[in-house]
């Protein structure tokens, strides 16, 4: 069973993924994969070096510097994102094949832009992760994501309502960690997925 997580930024998708791990799930964390690609993928690093001055430091992409180019969101950025998404897709396909070969029962995909990039096509179920706007704003503030960057991120994502409609389950992360865990447990129990 492959479950994917979707939702807005700062809603707690990574925490939900960690909860699924408590039930034996193996998580594909696309953010971690991207961070690794920024260190070792020569084509991505080369493209960044040519198109985003100052972004490559000591042979690796500096994510802080790179984030400044995101605000421009021009054709160079779109091409860069396409390169990154293609590399992540290769890693995802490898991950799924490897885990299926050893008969892993539960995989969880924690992938930003899951629906926008069609990564959801690899999944059996989609879980929409939601937090109320006050909690989400607090989390974004803790991550130093300002309103301008949030608006830009929102512009390239499907609307929250579209994500909700495409989902099989909804998890609310606004209340407490215990409540989130209980919702994950309910999903696992309903699907008879205890591994």
UniProtKB/Swiss-Prot annotation:
It is found in: Cytoplasm. One of its GO terms (cellular component) is cytoplasm. Its main location: cytoplasm. It is an enzyme of class 2 (transferase). Its EC number is 2.7.1.24. Pathway: Cofactor biosynthesis; coenzyme A biosynthesis; CoA from (R)-pantothenate: step 5/5. This is Dephospho-CoA kinase. It comes from Wolbachia pipientis wMel. The gene is coaE.
């Amino acid at each position: 069973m492959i479950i994917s997580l979707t939702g807005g930024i700062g809603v707690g998708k990574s925490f939900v993924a960690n909860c699924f791990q408590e039930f034996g799930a193996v998580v594909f964390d696309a953010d971690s994969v991207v961070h690794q690609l920024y260190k070792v993928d020569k084509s991505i690093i080369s493209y960044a070096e040519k198109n985003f001055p100052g972004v490559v430091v000591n042979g690796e992409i500096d994510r802080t510097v790179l984030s400044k180019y995101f605000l421009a969101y021009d054709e160079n950025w779109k091409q860069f994102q396409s390169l990154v998404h293609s590399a992540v897709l290769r890693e995802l396909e490898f991950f799924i094949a490897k885990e299926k070969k050893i008969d892993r029962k539960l995989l969880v995909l924690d992938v930003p832009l899951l629906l926008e990039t069609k990564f959801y096509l690899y999944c059996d179920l989609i879980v929409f992760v939601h937090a109320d706007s006050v909690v989400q704003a607090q989390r974004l503030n803790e991550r130093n994501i300002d309103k301008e960057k949030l608006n830009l991120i929102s512009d390239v994502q499907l609307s929250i309502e579209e994500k909700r409609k495409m989902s099989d389950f909804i998890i609310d992360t606004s209340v407490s960690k215990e409540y989130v865990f209980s919702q994950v447990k309910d999903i696992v129990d309903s699907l008879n997925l205890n591994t």
